[in-house]
Amino acid sequence: SRNNFVIKWIKKTKSYVELSSMYGLLRITPITPEVIRVSFVKGVTEKIGDTAWKGKADTAFSWNAKESKTLVEIATEKVTVRIAKNNGAVCFYNEKKQLLLAEKAEEPRFQEGRCNWIFFDWEKSEHLKAKGLLAADFMDVTAKAKYISYGGKKLRMPLILSEKGYGLAIASKGTVLFCGIRTFGPYIMAEGSQSDYYFISEKNREKLVEIYQRTLTLRYCSQAGIF
């Protein structure tokens, strides 16, 4: 039921903010001023696991968290994240406090077995693209259903880019399905033991891809200089 998503308690550490509901544990981690990690695991006793990608900020930077009766707000100089306490849905705003993206308030996420669905409220007119393997390769996924994972061959996260000035990088080594068809979602489904994605705020597409490549390649690949 929808009541399962109600936020019951909140814990802030130096690296992240955790919000717990009857459905599971949501963690918001500022990675850089432009990049926010959103992780979720189903179950009241479960913990967010480490992945092959960046789990927290490498370099300390300024961000703050505050709480009102209805909201939890986490802000860097570039991004403000608001989580509604009554449903656990996450909304992202740019530095001008303009809404860029919202998870669906009715049911923000669903987890069954190793399949994780995140439901988003994309605007009807919003143009969305998925990054391909080549630098200039972008596939239009507006109002379509497409597999956007690299089939396990490439050690990179699937990346969705919006003309509104943000990107979504999905932290899954398994299958990732993007569905922009309103009748069925819209949603992103990713395989894994937890739901994990990175929100990137940047208007310029080249810069956004640069941030994605610099910040969000696999830890051991960046250390070895592969990317």
Please place each PLM-identified region on the residue numbering:
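Hydrophobic/aromatic beta-strand elements that line small-molecule binding cavities or substrate pockets
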Residues: L25-I28, M157
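Catalytic and substrate-binding clefts that recognize carbohydrates or anionic sugar/phosphate headgroups
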Residues: S20-S21, K66-G225
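Extended Gly/Ser/Thr-rich low-complexity repeat segments
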Residues: R27-E34, K47-A57, R82-K96, A224
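A low-complexity, Ser/Thr/Gly/Pro-enriched, surface-exposed linker/loop concept
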Residues: S1-I10, K14, T29-V72, P108-G113
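Noncatalytic nucleic-acid binding interfaces
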Residues: S1, S21-M22
